[in-house]
């Protein structure tokens, strides 16, 4: 009977998760998501692919990371992993964008999937970004990223 309730609880959690997504979204429970054949995990966080998301990705603070599948599909693997790690980083360092950038950059550098040439692509992607209310300007972000990549 206990197993029945555990299974029912998982099904209800999945149903609640899917209610907040559109019909084109795909939800992946913890431990089931991969990028270009590389398994990706962020603790107990679900990944939700949504082609209509108005950003590359976002962490909702409720155990979900939403990713724009169209935008991600246009990026090389290392940049996909950066964005996923950046959003995952918000679960570890909070809402600070510079801290999430730094967390993702160091993770990629230390795990070996973010070599210097891939890091240069990231800097190019951000250098002319104007920023917004929540995100620093491109030059500020690039400066922070360079410090993170070169520091321990």
Give residue spans per PLM region.
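Bacterial N-terminal signal peptides that target proteins for export
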Residues: 2-12
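N-terminal signal peptide c-region/cleavage motif recognized by signal peptidases
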Residues: 20-22
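Auxiliary, metal-adjacent structural segments of Zn-dependent hydrolase domains
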Residues: 24-61
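Active-site scaffold of zinc-dependent metalloenzymes
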Residues: 48-77, 88-91
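Active-site recognition of the HExxH zinc-binding catalytic motif
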Residues: 82-91, 101
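An active-site-proximal "capping" alpha-helix that borders the catalytic cofactor pocket
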Residues: 95-111
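Long, well-structured alpha-helical subdomains associated
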Residues: 113-152
């Amino acid at each position: 009977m206990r197993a029945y309730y555990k299974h029912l609880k998982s099904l209800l959690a999945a149903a609640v998760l899917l209610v907040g997504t559109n019909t084109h979204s795909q939800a992946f429970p913890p431990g089931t998501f991969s990028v270009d054949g590389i398994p990706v995990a962020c603790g107990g966080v679900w990944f939700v692919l949504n082609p209509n998301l108005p950003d590359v990705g976002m962490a909702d603070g409720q155990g979900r990371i939403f990713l724009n599948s169209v935008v991600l599909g246009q990026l090389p693997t290392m940049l996909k992993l950066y964005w996923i790690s950046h959003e995952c980083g918000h679960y570890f360092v909070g809402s600070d964008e510079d801290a999430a950038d730094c967390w993702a950059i160091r993770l990629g550098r230390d795990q070996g999937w973010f070599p210097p040439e891939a890091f240069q692509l990231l800097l190019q992607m951000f250098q002319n970004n104007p920023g917004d209310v929540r995100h620093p300007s491109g030059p500020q972000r690039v400066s922070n990223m360079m410090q993170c990549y070169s520091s321990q």
